[in-house]
Amino acid sequence: MLLLISPINTEEALEAIEGGADIVDVKNPAEGSLGANFPWVIRRVREMTPEDMLVSATLGDVPYKPGTVSLAAMGALVSGADYIKVGLYGTRNYDEAVDVMKNVVRAVKDQSDAIVVAAGYADAHRVGAVEPMEIPRVAADSGADLAMLDTAVKDGKTLFDFMDMEKLESFVSAARDHGLKSALAGSVGREHLKPLHEIGCDVVGIRGAACVGGDRNTGRIHRDAVRELKELLDSF
């Protein structure tokens, strides 16, 4: 299981790199769960990250505007992102989600082999977004590479407050059945890593647990916390 760490700036990115993260995921929590950062930040993080380490960029908690989102995907791509994550926030159902993702996939795959991630929300019902269990099918039918879940509302509730391990295992299995990788995030802590590993999750996304004090908003990512998480994952 790969460790994805989500820094908000170059200082945190360096901590993630030095701590041994597999994927450095540039985001901007000030703009939402999967808030987008600026192209120049993504570019600088790519420049400072070793070539054998992947850089991911979130496009935001996106609206149902396929043109806008596909153009944003190109921005992430030319900034150097290897993973391009789309938070399907404003897409209310399968059809809208596939429409957005198909256009993102076309924009990206016409230019590169970057990995496209369809990201839904375990608490989708709180924001009117497409249901989480639809995400593997959305990803597969649009030609994306990876199906992901996070939480939309960051109010202390975790992924596990909305989906139990049986449901999460079904999500991972559905992704695998479609030939996709899976990723899970949403206030994931150390205690969750082994259960997620056991259900076959491919990527785990973390910010809070890698921060000093464990707070995704007021804390800062520290290499020691990242290293401890990576060592724990490697022990499974």
UniProtKB/Swiss-Prot annotation:
Protein's pathway: Cofactor biosynthesis; methanofuran biosynthesis
EC number: 4.2.3.153
SUPFAM superfamilies: Aldolase, Inosine monophosphate dehydrogenase (IMPDH)
Pfam families, per database record: 4HFCP_synth
Active-site positions on this chain: 27, 85
Reactions mediated catalytically: 2 D-glyceraldehyde 3-phosphate = 4-(hydroxymethyl)-2-furancarboxaldehyde phosphate + phosphate + 2 H2O
Keyword set includes Lyase: yes
InterPro entries xref list: 4HFCP_synth, 4HFCP_synth_arc
GO biological process: methanofuran biosynthetic process
GO MF entry, a single one: carbon-carbon lyase activity
Family per record: Belongs to the MfnB family.
Task of the protein: Catalyzes the formation of 4-(hydroxymethyl)-2-furancarboxaldehyde phosphate (4-HFC-P) from two molecules of glyceraldehyde-3-P (GA-3-P).
Protein name, UniProt field: (5-formylfuran-3-yl)methyl phosphate synthase
Species this protein is from: Methanothermobacter thermautotrophicus (strain ATCC 29096 / DSM 1053 / JCM 10044 / NBRC 100330 / Delta H)
Gene name of the encoded protein: mfnB
